[in-house]
Design a protein with these regions (language model features):
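N-terminal type II signal-anchor transmembrane helix
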Residues: 4-37
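Short secondary-structure transition/capping segments
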Residues: 9, 120-126, 168-174
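A structural signal for short, hydrophobic/glycine-enriched beta-strand patches
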Residues: 32-163
């Protein structure tokens, strides 16, 4: 009888763990591996976010600018770095966000966009970062932000993004 009582609670526990694992896996794929993206079109500015896949993002942002999607290219750069980009027909602005996070980038772009009366931008983010970046820009930028991610998704990016998204949804709820 004692053995049977032990097995009665094991099955629901195992089922609950399995359902939780599948739910987390599906949400990870939807939010971070294949996030909602947008098709680029002509906008006022292209914004390249900094971070781990920076060179891949930068290449994509430069290509979008050279393909005449926008007359202005904003590049988020680490503090103490220099901006040495010159493109024909494109104004290049390098900026150091404060804080040096996606939230800091969204704040800077939101302020600059307001000053320059930009109504549409393209944001080039890391693929895993796209969902959280969209949330941050929705809070700080009052125009239309299209997201065109670059770079592969690594498992450590997904783990990081779960924590960063939870923080953005619970602790840092403002711009």
């Amino acid at each position: 009888m004692n053995r049977r009582k032990r097995s009665l609670w094991k099955r629901p526990l195992i089922a609950g763990i399995a359902v939780s694992a599948v739910t987390i896996l599906v949400l990870s794929v939807v939010l971070f591996v294949w996030p909602r993206t947008d098709t680029p079109r002509e906008v006022d500015a292209i914004v390249v976010l900094g971070g781990g896949s920076g060179p891949i993002r930068l290449t994509k942002g430069l290509k979008l600018a050279l393909d005449d999607y926008a007359p202005t290219l904003l590049i988020s750069t680490p503090e103490h770095s220099t901006c040495r980009y010159s493109l024909p027909r494109v104004s290049v602005i390098c900026f150091h966000p404060s804080p040096g996070t996606t939230q800091g980038e969204a704040r800077y772009v939101g302020k600059l966009a307001s000053e320059r009366h930009w109504s549409q931008i393209i944001v080039v983010s890391g693929r895993a970062q796209t969902t959280r970046a969209r949330l941050r820009f929705d809070r700080c930028y009052h125009g239309t932000a299209l997201f065109d991610p670059a770079g592969p998704v690594k498992i450590q990016n997904v783990v990081y993004e779960w924590g960063a998204l939870a923080k953005a949804l619970t602790i840092q709820r403002d711009c």
